[in-house]
């Protein structure tokens, strides 16, 4: 696995790529892809899709997921996203439901969130790879160290970013974010198991658009 990442990200993350934990992580992931016969997701070229879809300085919103979808052909390197021909997973269905209800718009009926990413939404999982049918199978191998650093770098070097933290894991990242510089929105995960614990009716998307407008940033179309 060679880290092929957009130039502005390479600049801010170069130190991280040279750390010992990251070198061990790369070695482990290479071995996984080589020996697990297509059962590691997403495909290698899409591991850093969230980074390659959005230059660092263009970030407006950060949405933090857990680890990639573990079903075949689902994960595409963007948190909560699937390719357009893939059935929309339940969590993303609930995200669309909240958008439609709160913003009074009709969402596009496909789950490819690249359309959000190119507008400034950084869709990052805390763990960037997974084995088929085994959620959290790549937990604790180094991805969390890396993505924590990514969140800290965004918080430190940018300003007036909206961070959407859904569920306990994402909310645990609050400590990495400077609340004096950014808007932090917290609620339950959009999973069917927890969507009614605050996610539906949270108005996160309304709050996000209001904040972007207040800070003279271009509106994001969440359709």
Swiss-Prot record:
EC number: 3.2.2.27
Keyword flag DNA damage: yes
Localization (cell): Cytoplasm
Family that this chain belongs to: Belongs to the uracil-DNA glycosylase (UDG) superfamily. UNG family.
Provenance organism: Borreliella afzelii (strain PKo) (Borrelia afzelii)
BP GO terms, sorted: base-excision repair, AP site formation via deaminated base removal
Role description: Excises uracil residues from the DNA which can arise as a result of misincorporation of dUMP residues by DNA polymerase or due to deamination of cytosine.
UniProt xrefs under SUPFAM superfamilies: Uracil-DNA glycosylase-like
GO CC terms in record: cytoplasm
GO molecular-function terms, A-Z: uracil DNA N-glycosylase activity
CDD domains tied to this protein: UDG-F1-like
Active-site residues (renumbered): 67 (proton acceptor)
Catalytic activity entry: Hydrolyzes single-stranded DNA or mismatched double-stranded DNA and polynucleotides, releasing free uracil
Superkingdom assignment: Bacteria
Keywords: Cytoplasm, DNA damage, DNA repair, Hydrolase
Name of the protein: Uracil-DNA glycosylase
Lineage, top ranks: Bacteria, Pseudomonadati, Spirochaetota, Spirochaetia, Spirochaetales
